[in-house]
């Protein structure tokens, strides 16, 4: 049976952790002949990113309410009702066969609107602890999907992993290059960087380079380039360090690296598993419900990563972990293999197939 002419409304926004997995599914279905339309908010990253991939996007007016002041909380119910009506208008005009919610502010009103319109609703939760929107919508969704085991306790959910780009899955299948003398450390703090990495790494590299040859590729985040470069120079370490505001080609960065120092966002954890790289994970301490620590446990329990809470992170602890890996390349390689073993490599196809099945049921 052909799926040509089927329509899907994708709801995802706010962060790359929501948008990029949704784009992977959208691209897959578009290649099967599906019409894809997006629901998001005009002031978040999906407004810029989604059109670059060739998908039309509609906007609704909705913001988060957690942690906001009393006035905004009192006004929130009225804004939610308005945004549901906006989403319902999009659904009435586009007439999707299925709606896929993958997190972000637009998913809540869009999910309710789908239910009111009688359109099948699929949810996908990327994190080990579900966000508030998906927790609420899970009770009305036709199918709930998640990346990690034991994410949902109140509803039955199917574990499918996180959809990631095919290029990264292919990279993980490539034979690993023999490590040279210099330990290659990729430092990634997200698009905004991570202040703790920016503050500590120049001193870490200076201390480690006295005992071990090391090269570093450090993504420092927006507006941090000059300051971090200067800090490396002051430590006499600018020669073996590539400092970038943002790394556009993560495939190249992963291919280059021996080990990754990073946060533990759901997409990052899934990508590390897919490409088969060992890591040192420092969960973002202010993440809602500390979900990054739970995300990290997947790799830590597999023996593929070290977990260093930011509260105890210092130069000595980072030097110690990196020195350990530099001196035991066999363990470094085994950690990478363990990471690949926990990867779910067909998550994109699994999410898409659930959408296809529900659309065909009508």
From Swiss-Prot:
It is found in: Cell inner membrane. It is a peripheral membrane protein. It catalyses: di-trans,octa-cis-undecaprenyl diphospho-N-acetyl-alpha-D-muramoyl-L-alanyl-D-glutamyl-meso-2,6-diaminopimeloyl-D-alanyl-D-alanine + UDP-N-acetyl-alpha-D-glucosamine = di-trans,octa-cis-undecaprenyl diphospho-[N-acetyl-alpha-D-glucosaminyl-(1->4)]-N-acetyl-alpha-D-muramoyl-L-alanyl-D-glutamyl-meso-2,6-diaminopimeloyl-D-alanyl-D-alanine + UDP + H(+). One of its GO terms (molecular function) is UDP-N-acetyl-D-glucosamine:N-acetylmuramoyl-L-alanyl-D-glutamyl-meso-2,6-diaminopimelyl-D-alanyl-D-alanine-diphosphoundecaprenol 4-beta-N-acetylglucosaminlytransferase activity. GO terms for cellular component: plasma membrane. Pathway: Cell wall biogenesis; peptidoglycan biosynthesis. One of its GO terms (biological process) is carbohydrate metabolic process. Its main location: membrane. UDP-N-acetyl-alpha-D-glucosamine binds at residues 15-17, 127, 165, 191, 247, 266-271, 292. Pfam families: Glyco_tran_28_C, Glyco_transf_28. Its EC number is 2.4.1.227. Signal peptide: none annotated. InterPro entries: GlcNAc_MurG, Glyco_trans_28_C, GlycoTrans_28_N. Keywords: Cell cycle, Cell division, Cell inner membrane, Cell membrane, Cell shape, Cell wall biogenesis/degradation, Glycosyltransferase, Membrane, Peptidoglycan synthesis, Transferase. Belongs to the glycosyltransferase 28 family. MurG subfamily. Cell wall formation. Catalyzes the transfer of a GlcNAc subunit on undecaprenyl-pyrophosphoryl-MurNAc-pentapeptide (lipid intermediate I) to form undecaprenyl-pyrophosphoryl-MurNAc-(pentapeptide)GlcNAc (lipid intermediate II). This is UDP-N-acetylglucosamine--N-acetylmuramyl-(pentapeptide) pyrophosphoryl-undecaprenol N-acetylglucosamine transferase. The gene is murG.
């Amino acid at each position: 049976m052909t799926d040509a002419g089927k329509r899907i409304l994708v709801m995802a926004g706010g962060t790359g952790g929501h948008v990029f997995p949704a784009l992977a599914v959208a691209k897959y279905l578009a290649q099967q002949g599906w019409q894809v339309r997006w629901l998001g908010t005009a002031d978040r990253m999906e407004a810029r990113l989604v059109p670059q991939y060739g998908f039309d996007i509609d906007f609704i007016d909705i913001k988060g309410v957690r942690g906001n002041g009393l006035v905004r909380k009192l006004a929130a119910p009225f804004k939610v009702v308005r945004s549901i009506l906006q989403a319902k208008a999009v659904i009435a005009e586009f007439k999707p066969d299925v709606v896929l919610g993958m997190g972000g502010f637009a998913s809540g009103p869009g999910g309710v609107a789908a239910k009111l319109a009688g359109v099948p609703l699929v949810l996908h939760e990327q994190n080990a602890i579900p966000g508030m929107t998906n927790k609420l919508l899970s009770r009305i969704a036709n199918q709930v999907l998640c990346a990690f085991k034991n994410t949902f306790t109140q509803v039955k959910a199917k574990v499918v992993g996180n959809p990631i780009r095919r290029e990264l899955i292919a990279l993980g299948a490539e034979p690993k290059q023999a490590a040279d003398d210099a330990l290659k450390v990729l430092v990634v703090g997200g698009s905004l960087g991570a202040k703790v990495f920016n503050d500590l790494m120049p001193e870490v590299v200076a201390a480690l380079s006295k005992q071990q040859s090391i090269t570093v590729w450090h993504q420092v985040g927006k507006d941090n380039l000059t300051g971090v470069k200067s800090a490396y120079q002051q430590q006499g370490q600018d020669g073996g360090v590539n400092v970038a505001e943002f790394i556009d080609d993560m495939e190249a960065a992963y291919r280059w690296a021996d080990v990754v120092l990073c946060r533990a966002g759901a997409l990052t954890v899934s990508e590390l598993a897919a490409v088969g790289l060992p890591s040192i994970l420092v969960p973002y301490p202010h993440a809602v419900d500390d979900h990054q620590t739970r995300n990290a446990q997947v790799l830590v329990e597999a023996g593929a990563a070290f977990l260093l809470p930011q509260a105890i992170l210092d130069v000595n602890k980072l030097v110690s972990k990196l020195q350990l890996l530099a001196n035991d390349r066999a363990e470094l390689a085994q950690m990478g293999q363990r990471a690949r073993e926990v990867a779910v490599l067909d998550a994109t196809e699994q999410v898409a197939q659930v959408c296809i099945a529900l659309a065909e049921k009508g």
